[in-house]
Amino acid sequence: MQHLVLIGFMGSGKSSLAQELGLALKLEVLDTDMIISERVGLSVRGIFEELGEDNFRMFEKNLIDELKTLKTPHIISTGGGIVMHENLKGLGTTFYLKMDFETLIKRLNQKEREKRPLLNNLTQAKELFEKRQALYEKNASFIIDARGGLNNSLKQVLQFIA
């Protein structure tokens, strides 16, 4: 078994699904944003504000290469922009948690939105969402309809890997 990699726009449920998959499959869960935050000593928002998005993307790219060297399979929850990296290919079996923009925004309360620097301006966020959709689909081994909630997404992933 390879890594199971969850991709999708911020707020699509990647972190929650990763935890459930980890329990169901008895695999360790890794969260790329959390790993980067812990290493740098700043929140994702803090990294964007103090070091810039380019540095965050460099940390992300380097982490992908590092994760490829792991010998055992993991569940990997990724940041929404990870699909911009060519080196994502070959990391594992990717599952795109697909959801429409309006549903994503409804799922995130104000506090959650404040943690996500790219959601400061909803018009720009929607443009980013639309640009990234093609990248998510291009990088996906499987597309998960995430509108049905966590349990439904979990069932879909488990069916694909059965």
Curated annotation (Swiss-Prot):
It comes from the Bacteria. Keywords: Amino-acid biosynthesis, Aromatic amino acid biosynthesis, ATP-binding, Cytoplasm, Kinase, Magnesium, Metal-binding, Nucleotide-binding, Transferase. Pathway: Metabolic intermediate biosynthesis; chorismate biosynthesis; chorismate from D-erythrose 4-phosphate and phosphoenolpyruvate: step 5/7. GO terms for cellular component: cytosol. Transmembrane segments: none annotated. CDD domains: SK (cd00464). Monomer. Catalyzes the specific phosphorylation of the 3-hydroxyl group of shikimic acid using ATP as a cosubstrate. Belongs to the shikimate kinase family. This is Shikimate kinase. The gene is aroK.
